[in-house]
Amino acid sequence: AFDVVEFELEEALCEPFRLNLKLASDKNAIDFRQVLDQPGTFTLWQDGRPARYVHGIVSHFTQGSSGFRRTRYELLLEPQLARLELCCNWRIFQEKSVPEILQALLKEHRVLDYEQRIYHEHLPREYCVQAGDSDHYLHDRLAFEEGLVYYFRFDEHRHTLVCSDRLYVQERIAGGPVLFSAQPEGDNPQPVLHSFRYSENVRTARQTQRDYSFKRPTYDQEHHLAGEALEHQGSSYERYDYPGRYKRSGAGRPFTESRLRGHRRDAREASVSGDDPRLIPGHAFALEGHPRADFNAWWRPVRVVHRGTQYAGQEEESADAPLGVSYDLRAELVPEDVEWRPAPLPRPRIDGPQIATVVGPAGEEIHCDEWGRVKV
């Protein structure tokens, strides 16, 4: 175990979290093999009780200077999902839906604490190609195309990756509402939010997509979708995308919907700061105490940065430290009823023709499907 001197936790919807820790130990020769690429848990305490757990895998470990009694260390904790960035591949997934592809991808990397919450039909993709992009980029690209969001749930011994196609029905934080107080920082007897800035931004109002399939060449598979909450902006700002990159009309509407939601992800947002550690991306909360009544509503964090220091426990080595113990957070929120989605990621491009191997059944040279296409 280490003594935590400083920490910074960055977490967001649809992103791997990063927990940077500055540590101290009375041991000056820790074996790196016992730490690097090993699981670890950070516990944030409040009023003598654990307020948050953050479990992850150590990605970076540094030994720093040694003082009179203690040696300083630095450590980076990330989820197992971040390890997918270390691998890339060239392959084709056939006749699998995106939830099935993601599940197979995570199983391949032994990400076993994984929970899918699927409420809508996701059609299988005839061909889905990974063209040299990293496994993590493929995971995010497919998830964002399909309108899936993910976040992490923690306990003392594990972190669970939760993936869903509906955000509105996800968790709410425990322990009652989050309080707002305009009093100066440090003057409140309980955790509060002490600043709240609400913004609205003009964004794309409509999304139109079209694509064709040789199976029905005269059908344009066109889909239109208008955004929500357009009362305060013009409704004529339209984005037209072609090709829509779907071969079935049943997939066209959710593709159009997820892209529009990604373009409008910050149309209504709030930036807050405070010291209530219960704020977690994806987990909704009720706000109370704001002087403007309509801000006292349900909100959902999409990004949170927690920072804390604990110099007092370093005894004589903390003599020149600027602070004793401190904690604060900054967060970005959206209204709870907003089906927030990340911006879509571009597909990788292949540079010119590729050499492929023609395959076929045993005893035959090639395999043709019902339209005469040769399988490679």
Predicted regions, residues:
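Amphipathic alpha-helical and helix-coil boundary elements used as assembly
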Residues: 1-376
